[in-house]
Amino acid sequence: HIVAAGGKRIRPMLTLSSAKLCGYKGDRHLALAACVEFIHTATLLHDDVVDTSILRRGESSANLLFGNQASVLVGDFLFSRAFQMMVEDGSLDVLRILSHASSVIAEGEVLQLTTVNNTETGENIYLEVIKSKTAQLFAAACEVGAVIAKRPAIEQRALETYGINLGITFQLVDDVLDYTAKQRNLGKTIGDDFKEGKVSLPVILAFSRGTSEERQFWRRTLESLDQTDTDLEYAIKLMSKHDALSDAIKRARHYGSIARDSLGIFDDNPIRSSLVGLIDFCIERAN
């Protein structure tokens, strides 16, 4: 079910591409790319249990089909198998990077629990959540490619910077898509986050710029989850009124620019061009 569910496989691609960008000639990057995808898939399985989600990538989620117990246990297995493969690789640096990323992801999950149904969540906390939950694994996926190629620290840091800012860009756009995309493009129905009471940047901006009456709307729909059939449409109108969606995209472009600049120390070649193109892909998803 997990394999058939598909996905963009961006994270393992980052490991493969980063290794190639750094001139790596071996095959260790293949298993490490799999480790990265195992970690990511494990977090998705656990996420869907925590969020009681019923869809993942436009299809029924694993927890809906097989139950919470199976989803948690398979997620645990994938985490365990990833660490087993890291140990088999034999690099303490790789183990340090990916174990740190796994720990930060878990911290981000806990931090996000404090923001659900909390309209007072600030932009700084939101950014900390997406850095931890999403961007940290992007960064680790890139960094291990440079590590196994034995590149100098400056190149490792450059790829880490690229990954963290690409991850932020990706998540910012993803949160915009929850209010704008068609199911076939996003892999979930529009308004999933709204219905679950998740507070993302478009909500934060619309809430902070809104009138007292509008803020009461957000409190009712997101904090109390007292929602009617027309509330999602009204929420999108408020976001448009206060430029919340367009400003979130501007933030995404800002972080995308940082990611692009971080690749400047590498020679221009097809791999680097692909990594730059990935930034554009993440942003253009909003269109």
Model-predicted regions and their roles:
Residues 1-287:
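All-alpha prenyltransferase/terpene-synthase fold signal
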